[in-house]
Amino acid sequence: MCVLYGTGHEYYSWTPSTSSGANLAGSVLSFGGVVFGSVIGWAPIAADYNVMLPEDTSAWKVFGLTFFGLFIPLVFVETLGALYGSALVNNAAWNAIYNDPEQGLGSVLGASLSSLNGFGKFLVFLLALSVVSNNVPNTYSAALSIQTLGKPFQRIPRFIWTIFVAVVYTVAGVAGKSHFSEILNNFLSILSYWTTPFVVVLALEHFVFRRRNGYNVNDYGDRSKLPLGLAAAAAGIIGVVGAVLGMNQTWYIGPIGKLTGTYGGDLGFEMALLLTSLVYLALRPLELNSFGR
């Protein structure tokens, strides 16, 4: 990655944005939604990788390692992506490669490293392997997530689910290879539409409703002692509805998403956060009073 920063530096553009006012705000909101989607996707699975830490591990240490373990690499890579996006404006050859359905972003990186000859090809090879290695945690966590759906799913060995997930995303990747950047951009945007309600419900449950009493770990295997999830389900559904109202995608623009500038701005995750919070804070006390759990 550091080499990529160097090989593309002569083409980086610092040209001020041509948009202003509400149009600029809409663009920033939409871009922010993509960035948020790339980060928030770790929220449902982060605990899979720190659950084995000693019980007396400082909460601040867990938070710090998790936060900075995500923040530093994500900012580093996304800044590089922004710089290469600006380089496409100044390098016609790279721009042509990027817009070629048969090549795309990976070929742009290859062209950037071509001046290094054999070493550049070696780095491209390492980049390809890094994509595979980065998918390993996602694949493992996907298998765990499937098993949380219920005992019928737990009866199937985890490695079977892991293979199944790998086959699914491999087929999807091959089928969408000609439109990879467009699909990835849309996926990251809509990813936050459901992960935001998920995170909000967990955060409110932890910091508000379990602030004093905490958790009894022995209850996790006993459904009669677990929350019914009525408040969570209602809040999640309303949150997704809010996301739909605020979304701004190529295939659909919600009524609230149209309000910012000429082309609108994506307010999907913000609307999901707001409505999920309001509904859960209103309904969870009623659920506790009615069912005691």
Residue ranges of each PLM-predicted region?
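Alpha-helical transmembrane segments in multi-pass membrane proteins
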Residues: 65, 69, 73, 77, ...
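TM-loop-TM module centered on a large, flexible mid-protein loop between adjacent transmembrane helices
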Residues: 80-134, 152, 173-181, 185-189
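C-terminal membrane-solvent junction of multi-pass transporters and transport-like membrane proteins
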Residues: 199-282
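C-terminal structural cap/anchor segments
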Residues: 167-219
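Inter-helical loop and helix-membrane interface segments of multi-pass membrane transporters/permeases
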Residues: 5-30, 98-104, 220, 247-265
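Helix-loop-helix connectors at the membrane interface of multi-pass transporters/channels
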Residues: 51-54, 136-164, 209-210, 214
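Hydrophobic, membrane-embedded alpha-helices of multi-pass small-molecule transporters
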Residues: 2-8, 18-86, 114-139, 225-243
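Loop-to-transmembrane helix boundary motifs in multi-pass membrane proteins
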Residues: 148-181, 223-243
